[in-house]
C-alpha cells in the first residue's frame, strides 16, 4: 500500500493514527495493526478493498453520515475499493486492516 489515496496511505500520512505493525501476506494482500484517537479519516475511492476489525475500544468511532452506529471490539467493517467515507475517531481504539 503506497498510493496516496489508499486507506493505508491516508492513515499513515493524513491522520494521527500510529502503525503498530504491517505485514505483506503475498498475492496483493497486506495486513496492518493501527491505533488511533481524537482524529478524523476521509477515504475517497482508495482503489482497493479494506476489511477492518476493531480490536480494542472504538465505542464512539463512527462514520460522519451514520452518527448513531458505533464500533466495538470484534465489529467488522468492509470498505469497498470505490467507496467514499468520512470517520470520526474520538476515544482510543486499536484495529486491524486487511488490504486487498
Regions found by a protein language model. Give the residues of each.
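N-terminal presequences and immediately downstream first alpha-helices
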Residues: 1-15, 40-50
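N-terminal regulatory/effector-sensing and dimerization cores
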Residues: 20-100
Amino acid at each position: 500500500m503506497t498510493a496516496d489515496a489508499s486507506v493505508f496511505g491516508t492513515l499513515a500520512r493524513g491522520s494521527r493514527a500510529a502503525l503498530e505493525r504491517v505485514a505483506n501476506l503475498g498475492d496483493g494482500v497486506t495486513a496492518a495493526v493501527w491505533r488511533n484517537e481524537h482524529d478524523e479519516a476521509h477515504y475517497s475511492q482508495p482503489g482497493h478493498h479494506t476489511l477492518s476489525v476493531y480490536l480494542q475500544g472504538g465505542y464512539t468511532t463512527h462514520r460522519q453520515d451514520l452518527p448513531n452506529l458505533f464500533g466495538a471490539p470484534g465489529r467488522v467493517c468492509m470498505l469497498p475499493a470505490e467507496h467514499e467515507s468520512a470517520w470520526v475517531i474520538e476515544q482510543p481504539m486499536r484495529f486491524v486492516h486487511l488490504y486487498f
